[in-house]
Amino acid sequence: MNDSPIISVVLPFLIKDNDDKSLNYQGINNLIISIDSIIEQTFKEWELILVDDGSNNEILEQLLSKRYSTDNRIKFIINKENKGIVKSLNDAILNHCSPTSKYIARMDSDDISHPTRLQSQLKYLQSNETIDILGCPIKMFNNNKLIEILNNNNNNNNINNNVKELINIINNEESFKFIQHPDKDILMWSMFFNCCIVHPSVIFKRSIFTIEHCYEENNQFPFIEDYLFWLKSLIMKGLNISNIQSSTPLLYLRKHNNSISFKNIEKQKDSTANASCYYLNILFKRFNIDSEIIQNSSLSMKEIIQFFQLSPSSLSKINNISIELFEFAFKYLELIEKSCTKQQPNYSNSIKDAANEKMGELVSLCLSNYPNNQKSSLLWEKWLSRNPTSQLLSLLSNLNVKSSTTIINNNINNNNNNNNNNNNNNNNNNNNNNNNNNNNNSILNFISGINSNKINTPKSNNNKFKENGIRIICFSKDRAFQLKEYLRTFFKYLKNDDNGNDKFEIIVDVLFTYSNEKFKNSYQLVIESFPQVNFIKEENFTDQLINLVQKTNKLEYVMFSVDDILYYNEFNLKEYCLSLNSEPLALGFYMKLNKNITYCHTCNQDITIPLNSNTISRTENNFKYLKWNRNDNDCKKDWNYPWDLCSTIYRCNDIDSIINGIVKYYGIRNGINHPNRFEFNGNRPIIQKQIYQNKPYCLCLSDHYSPMSVVTINRVQDVYDNPIYDQTLSLDDLDQLLYSNKSLNDEKYKENSLSLNFKSVHIGELFIS
């Protein structure tokens, strides 16, 4: 029994009988799965408040009572009459939460929470104390498709009540959509176009929810009680809202035709546009922003907002968009940007980047529709004057327009010359690429996937001007101890066999960030211990990453790393790069893999070494490596994860092309603004065979052991709560190890590796010395 819960999970439900008066077994089963997903949380200090909002079903009540009555963490509230979602939520939160509860988490009756959802969200809130409301990544799954998969497995009854098995199936189904909404930097900006925080994924501070600030029933804005609460929290209360940025979904959202949101989708869209206009007008008045240009137009604010609510693919299919709509939409974006910047000045740079991206999409479509119109060219000039990033310029240079192409390319080249006077070679390459890409699709086509069969592998800059060597880029957040161990063992086991005649340069960079002053001080200790390393405080991940990889990198190869990697066997980066150089059809050299990797911890299942793998011996010094084709059917999980940040070596020109591919498909803001997203979005277009099918091969060591492992003693984004995590440490625990002068016992890890005890890339054993 938990008498002092920290989190109150509120789950309202209404389950009616089927149309033929039979019991709604599907609805009941979905509810049970939803409840069980909370019971199976790794974080245990919770209470679950179940609100039956007028089901009036004795069989249902008896079933739930029999199944859950012995769990004192679960409370039942039964409304004999249907009160509606707003009154049910307000009553549960204001009147039925335990006094000790500090946070409120939402849950819906047909969704599934990942086992680490509450733990991950609480950890984030405790590390980011200024955040008041927090969402998380979700994966949206179609209920009919899931039932079809279960039926095909011939074990429907066994799986349908098993939370982890269901999550496993949903994660492995590529047709189910992963959704990652923006973080605090641009959440307000994004909120005016569409609701970008998923209600059942939310956890918020209990202290912000009062009689004066709660969910509202508003006839002016029906069916969007959550969206209204977010807007009111942001604009009227000045609260901070964010979403966890991770490639791991923490909530699985079920979509089916019987859901309230599905039945009222058009009304919700209309209410969303009305509410957006209402709160934007509040901001315009608050900051004396002159919106007369919009008010005097033939288009209403609502019409322009509804224009922005359409997806890029939908917009690209509309042939009769007037040039005036493009003009007013651009001006409206300027007003929204100005109001958001006034409301949240700390995020002004991120808001500007997001505005540039949306304006870029608008200008792209305008030029495609009106290639010979002077107003289109003026819009382009206006957007260009905002100094958008070179990546956005590069995308828009690929517009499929006629007479505007020369204007665009000239302006891009002029802008590049003005901003990058020292990069003449790069500008010349860009000019050539721009001239060769006039027939490519626009940014909107890349984003929406239209005509994907016409999308070619992105062109990359030639590596012939790069110098012989490798740049190591390690990412770290709040884990100074693990970063110290990464660097200590990296230099301990790095073999340097330069003979002076064939210099191989190695540069090590660390891009790090921290959430509080304590961790900042810890990083300072690490910085002082490794003067040979370039430490860079993360301020803008996207810009800094591109600067390291593309703008300032002079070396031929790049290896990405994360701070929880530990090296324990000797390794030779030069040999690995030479092996990659000898295999032009290979994408990367994967230091984490070896012939003993036969288990994938993230999906909790055994995997096999690719049957087509061959041991290759280089003639120079008989160095041996393993080579396999990742496109073969038996290449699963770790053996088909081409874009990887765990000590994988890539050619610099391939990295350029993959980054360009990420931006084309997912946008610069959403594509590469975080290490997890950078890795996840890099894999999606490769695995889905949209890019890089001309390099299907992968390389690794031919031995049965690797020089390193990912030591997950403090996990960040893992999918499954496997037994290897029994000794998981908190960030504070790790920091204490740093100040106690402790180290990971790399000799012990080496001993286990040579004994072939490590069958997974990720290991959870904790050996301290």
From Swiss-Prot:
Site (Important for Gal-transferase activity) location in chain: D53, D226
Highest taxon above the source species: Eukaryota
Resulting phenotype, D497N: Slight decrease in Gal-transferase activity
Site (Important for Gal- and Fuc-transferase activities): D509
Residues covered by region (Alpha-1,2-fucosyltransferase): 442-769
Site (Important for Fuc-transferase activity): D654
Biological process, per Gene Ontology: SCF complex assembly
One GO CC annotation: cytoplasm
Keywords linked to the UniProt accession: Glycosyltransferase, Transferase
Phenotype for D654N: Loss of Fuc-transferase activity and 80% decrease in Gal-transferase activity
Annotated region described as Disordered, given as residue ranges: 410-442
Family, similarity comment: Belongs to the glycosyltransferase 2 family.
Function: Bifunctional protein composed of 2 glycosyltransferase domains involved in glycosylating skp1. The N-terminal part catalyzes the transfer of a galactose residue to GlcNAc-skp1 in a beta 1-3 linkage. The C-terminal part catalyzes the transfer of a fucose residue to Gal-GlcNAc-skp1 in an alpha 1-2 linkage.
Protein name, UniProt field: Bifunctional glycosyltransferase pgtA
